[in-house]
Amino acid sequence: MKNEEYNIKLAAYIEQLQELRKEAVSLATGIIGETLCMDDLFFCASVDRCIRLIDGLIPMLRDRNLTCVGVLLRIQMDNCMRTYAAFIAEDRNAVIRCILDGTPIKSLKDAKGNKMLDGYLKDEVAKIDPIFSKVYNNASGYVHLSEKAFYQTVDSCDNYEIGIQI
């Protein structure tokens, strides 16, 4: 895709991201009331991280830095999964304590008794958004050195030639 085509398509996506950012700011404003409890602190941290990731994503999209876009997308999806974990947890406060204390939630269970491992959380969120698993798996290729790194360096040229771009 040529830069002009890319920029035209990108403008619509950036507009959507900016709308999502506004919604996130509005959510955070609604969370913060006269009193703050642990839930409020957790959800404010989740929303703030979401906003900051959107703010980082937009310039990376404009620069066509797909490696960073993929990594930021994956982090955003992890943020979503951890936030969702608080809603399905057997003990929401335990999830919130783990996240605020910086400890993994993988030993905690959801209301059905399942350990909240990343794979399980991914599958649970995919029940809400059917493409979540596919996007998560593809974005993971940017986090780990994989075929994504190879295909980003290869550029097709004329006469059945390929070029390597770094």
What are these regions (language model features)?
Residues 16-18, 76, 152, 165:
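Residue-identity detector for glutamine
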Residues 1-4, 117-123, 164-165:
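Charged, low-complexity surface segments at secondary-structure and domain boundaries
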Residues 1-46:
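N-terminal, Lys/Arg-enriched amphipathic/low-complexity engagement segments
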Residues 46-52:
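Helix-boundary capping/turn motifs
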Residues 29-41, 55-58, 62-66, 71-137, ...:
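Short non-catalytic regulatory patches outside canonical folded cores
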